[in-house]
């Protein structure tokens, strides 16, 4: 079993929890609350900006020029391509996407997730740590989307079904590159290093769950009441 396969199998129970949580289940049925959509889109817009910065940090550590080229292409996709999925959700609540994301948010769960990835980018020379922290993002979306497309409860009459259609295919090239890089970059790692890299992957999978839930509950910072706002 390859290392990338091992860590993805270990993450499956967490992904099952993500799928069964309120955000995905309501999205599946086409009745996700509009404020949850707004919170998700605003937080994800901030998240994706930082994700592109993390790609830039990976470029000097990339093993080959082919990998560098792919990372540059992914920066372009993050800036333009993934907006398509966001616009599907904006259409669902009948609000312009650009208007929704004018309001910037930085909720606790998004903050913790981003800092987790930046930590590994700066703390470890081996890019495997950072890739392991980033890889659950595309992987979770693909698995959840494919699960939804096989679910008889998927509301095909709702525009939200197109969100699942998008993520069922569009993440595949990135997942394959991340898998190959993880297998290559961990080939000579010690067992302890592999354990730490695996933990980075699993922690990010939990961060993915928290991120969806953050939108679902409209998570905010609580500094002790309105007087400290």
From Swiss-Prot:
Keywords: Hydrolase, Thiamine biosynthesis
Biological or metabolic pathway of the protein: Cofactor biosynthesis; thiamine diphosphate biosynthesis
Domain of life of the source: Bacteria
Assigned GO CC terms: cytosol
Molecular functions (GO terms): thiaminase activity
Keyword Hydrolase set for record: yes
Active site (record annotation): 137 (nucleophile), 208 (proton donor)
Keyword Ion transport among record annotations: no
Catalytic activity: 4-amino-5-aminomethyl-2-methylpyrimidine + H2O = 4-amino-5-hydroxymethyl-2-methylpyrimidine + NH4(+); thiamine + H2O = 5-(2-hydroxyethyl)-4-methylthiazole + 4-amino-5-hydroxymethyl-2-methylpyrimidine + H(+)
Pfam family, one: TENA_THI-4
Binding of substrate, residues: 44, 141, 167
InterPro entries recorded: Haem_Oase-like_multi-hlx, Thiaminase-2/PQQC, Thiaminase_II, Thiamine_Salvage_TenA
GO biological process: thiamine biosynthetic process; thiamine diphosphate biosynthetic process
Site note Increases nucleophilicity of active site Cys, residues: 47
EC number: 3.5.99.2
Protein family: Belongs to the TenA family.
Quaternary structure annotation from Swiss-Prot or TrEMBL: Homotetramer.
Function: Catalyzes an amino-pyrimidine hydrolysis reaction at the C5' of the pyrimidine moiety of thiamine compounds, a reaction that is part of a thiamine salvage pathway. Thus, catalyzes the conversion of 4-amino-5-aminomethyl-2-methylpyrimidine to 4-amino-5-hydroxymethyl-2-methylpyrimidine (HMP). Is also able to catalyze the hydrolytic cleavage of thiamine; however, this thiaminase activity may not be physiologically relevant. Therefore, is probably involved in the regeneration of the thiamine pyrimidine from thiamine degraded products present in the environment, rather than in thiamine degradation.
PANTHER family attached to this UniProt entry: BIFUNCTIONAL TH2 PROTEIN, SI:CH1073-67J19.1-RELATED
Protein's name in the database: Aminopyrimidine aminohydrolase
Organism: Staphylococcus haemolyticus (strain JCSC1435)
